[in-house]
From Swiss-Prot:
Active site residues per record: 101
GO cellular component: cytosol
Binding positions (Mg(2+)): 101, 240, 242, 244
Reported cofactor(s): Mg(2+)
Protein name (database record): Phosphoglucosamine mutase
NCBIfam families: glmM, PRK10887.1
Entry-linked InterPro entries: A-D-PHexomutase_a/b/a-I, A-D-PHexomutase_a/b/a-I/II/III, A-D-PHexomutase_a/b/a-II, A-D-PHexomutase_a/b/a-III, A-D-PHexomutase_C, A-D-PHexomutase_C_sf, Alpha-D-phosphohexomutase_SF, GlmM_bact
SUPFAM superfamilies given in the database record: Phosphoglucomutase, C-terminal domain (SSF55957), Phosphoglucomutase, first 3 domains (SSF53738)
Length: 446
């Protein structure tokens, strides 16, 4: 059945438009409460990132849940993976995160975790949608839900993250620049690395409700790259607004993306024979160099559609524990149930310390193929497969690549853009081809 409200990662949009308004969020909270409270008194955790609209959405969800008879625990600003962990840890019935991830402050959204810390199933999302479309009724007064602040949330998550790092290792001797994206990680990430012994230089750690992901974070690492070089740091770490993805920077100031980090982690586990991966899941956007490198090490590789929930679905189907995306969402089921930027960073730092090698050397295990990604803004819906201009451009692009590359055009599941990706052996031809395709998409939207 087609979903009416839920997208690929919860519900997301422009604040004040579409579904991201107080009225709909009140109804959404009530609908979630109705689904959860059918058989018992339920408790839901609510966390958020640092967007100004988070206050409005949090209050509306809280009121709706209470009206349905559900108790609420409020954590305040917390990374998405922290809510996944805490939901299971405190035996809550569900967790809610108010965030639009890597998007800027005018956007916001809501995503959900079940009692085990995993994203909701399609069946549960459809059940919630069914309730949204019903008239809202408030339970009698003695059954209303209560709300309380969970003051220990930060401390519990910090200690959990530290527990994933070997107790016989420290980060002493490492200087780390941490870019918190003015987002949810600002209150926990610098403390975690500092408490493990690193010298920490924190940047983009002063959120004001409007500056989340603004020229900072995992989607814009230029300032982090400059700061790593300026401070003569060993490594840079960039989170996105809700802390579930990670991009790193080596001591030369060069980006290390999710494909490279995933490759480093997989090969490390393979040689340690600790939870040695039977296989690794990437996506249709993953660099061909990742697939080729893993296969050279006799590690199977499969591609899922884009989106960490699809990565996780395929991991669970295969019985594998490691997967991720080029964008820096990396899921390690040995530690977490969803992408966690802090825990991924700790695993890479562990490998650096144990191997006594800088990140610049570790990433050499994988040779990336030239790849260009261009996001083309669109209005409304564009049927890529049926548009004659785009079809003609794709035919021309295939001629330019001459069988030595990949072309992918797809609509984003979280933003009003068409993503144009071209990969091949010659960087100049790849860039030229990507720009030609992007121009064709842009012309088709006029």
């Amino acid at each position: 059945m087609q979903k009416k409200y839920f997208g690929t990662d919860g519900i997301r949009g422009k604040v004040g438009n579409s579904l991201i308004n107080a009225e709909f969020m009140l109804k959404l909270g009530w609908a979630v409460g109705r689904v959860l409270a059918n058989s018992h008194s339920a408790t839901v955790l609510i966390g958020k990132d640092t967007r100004i609209s988070g206050y409005m959405i949090e209050s509306a969800l809280q009121a709706g849940l209470s009206a349905a008879g559900v108790n609420i625990k409020l954590t305040g600003p917390m990374p998405t993976p922290a809510i996944a962990y805490l939901t299971h840890s405190v035996r809550a019935d569900a967790g809610i995160v108010i965030s639009a991830s890597h998007n800027h402050y005018p956007d916001n959204g809501v995503k959900f975790f079940n009692k085990d810390g995993f994203k909701l199933s399609d069946e549960l999302e459809l059940a919630i949608e069914k309730q949204i479309d019903k008239p809202m009724k408030t339970v009698v007064a003695d059954r209303l839900g209560k709300a309380a602040r969970m003051n220990e949330a930060h401390g519990r998550y910090i200690e959990f993250c530290k527990s994933t790092f070997p107790s016989n290792l420290t980060l002493k001797g490492l200087k780390i620049v941490v870019d918190c994206a003015n987002g949810a990680a600002y209150a926990v990430a610098p403390s975690i690395f500092h408490e493990l012994g690193a010298e920490v230089v924190a940047i983009a750690d002063d959120p004001d409700g409007f500056n989340i992901n603004q020229t900072c974070g995992a989607t814009d690492t230029a300032h982090l790259q400059e700061m790593v070089v300026k401070h003569n740091a060993d490594v840079g770490i960039a989170f996105d607004g809700d802390g579930d993805r990670l991009i790193m920077v080596d001591h030369h100031g060069l980006r290390v993306d999710g494909d490279e980090l995933l490759c480093i982690m997989a090969i490390d586990r393979f040689y340690l024979k600790e939870n040695a991966p039977l296989g690794v899941v990437g996506t249709i956007m993953s660099n061909l160099g990742l697939e080729q490198t893993l296969k050279r090490h006799h590690i199977a590789f499969e591609r899922s559609p884009v989106g960490d929930r699809y990565v996780l679905d395929l991991m669970q189907q295969k019985g594998w524990f490691l997967g991720g995306e080029s964008s820096g969402h990396i899921v390690d089921l040995g530690f977490t149930t969803t992408g966690d930027g802090v825990i991924t960073a700790l695993q890479i730092l562990r490998i650096m310390q144990q191997a006594e090698k800088p990140l610049a050397d570790l990433k050499k295990v994988m040779v990336k193929h030239p790849q260009v990604l261009i996001n083309v803004p669109i209005k409304g819906i564009l049927d890529i497969a049926q548009n004659p201009n785009i079809k003609k451009a794709i035919t021309e692009a295939e001629k330019q690549l001459n069988g030595a590359g990949r072309i992918l055009l797809r609509p984003s599941g979280t933003e009003p853009v068409i993503r144009v990706m071209v990969e091949g052996s010659d960087e100049g031809i790849v860039r030229q081809t990507a720009e030609m395709l992007a121009a064709a998409v842009q012309q088709s939207t006029l």
